[in-house]
Amino acid sequence: MQIVNISAYKFVTLEDIETLRPVMRERCDAAGLKGTILLAPEGINMFLAGTREQIDEFMAWLHADARFADIAPKESLSENQPFKRMLVRAKKEIITMKMPLIRPEAGRAPSVRPVDLKRWLDQGHDDDGRPVVMLDTRNAFEVAVGTFDKAVEYGIDKFSEFPPAVAENKAEFEGKTIVSFCTGGIRCEKAAIHMQEVGIDHVYQLEGGILKYFEEVGGSHYNGDCFVFDYRTALNPNLEPAGPVQCFACRAVVTPEEQQHPKYVVGKSCPHCVDTATQAAA
């Protein structure tokens, strides 16, 4: 049976989370879906999986709410259900930055479509002649799986480390067009809004993130695969599961080459953690 995997988010003011949460959980359970929905005062973020009929049933219900009517989820297919349970959680932020909350009523950050970004990268500048800087807003272990050519990345371990990293490097963005990007769009949108708020000009988010870029223009100007937070671990530019897997013990990304290493034991250890695991067992 083919499973439809969807991810979607929207920055929108939610003042009824206490009542919305149980209703949303009930609808997901009734549709037979599994996954996670995060609700916060600044919006919604969701990762769901089910049959085509189940997904369509839930999205029809969600779109009936004017606040969510324009949510357009990104889809991929799998042979198995990637989630074990259904969770609907109330959070302070839908993606944790530990900065003042996004003000949805102030509008979205400017975005650039994948096809336009590819054109900018092909020609070496944006439509106004400014150099384009690709800014990776993801964590270091995600970046290691793949990223855009010559992308700037700060080696962060969590998204809350992004604002101070930007503050330290703000001067480097002067006179350039900055395109923030992430897996599916949520982090790069919040990052772009933050950069605008601290006075950085000419900031865009990559519309739909890396996965939308893969879907619309393929892997041009991109090296490697895209890490995803489910059992597939990484997707190639054809949106197919790639070779890397995650180590069950330490959660590090293990490349196909590293999987051939004698220290890689499925479910127990990998070259990144085997020495630590051995010491702990001693």
From Swiss-Prot:
The active site is at 182 (cysteine persulfide intermediate). GO terms for biological process: tRNA modification. Its EC number is 1.14.-.-. One of its GO terms (molecular function) is oxidoreductase activity, acting on paired donors, with incorporation or reduction of molecular oxygen. Keywords: Oxidoreductase, tRNA processing. This is tRNA uridine(34) hydroxylase. Catalyzes oxygen-dependent 5-hydroxyuridine (ho5U) modification at position 34 in tRNAs. Pfam families: Rhodanese, UPF0176_N. SUPFAM superfamilies: Rhodanese/Cell cycle control phosphatase (SSF52821). Residues 128-222 form the Rhodanese domain. It catalyses: uridine(34) in tRNA + AH2 + O2 = 5-hydroxyuridine(34) in tRNA + A + H2O. PANTHER family: RHODANESE-LIKE DOMAIN-CONTAINING PROTEIN 7-RELATED (PTHR43268:SF3), THIOSULFATE SULFURTRANSFERASE/RHODANESE-LIKE DOMAIN-CONTAINING PROTEIN 2 (PTHR43268). The gene is trhO. Belongs to the TrhO family. It is an enzyme of class 1 (oxidoreductase).
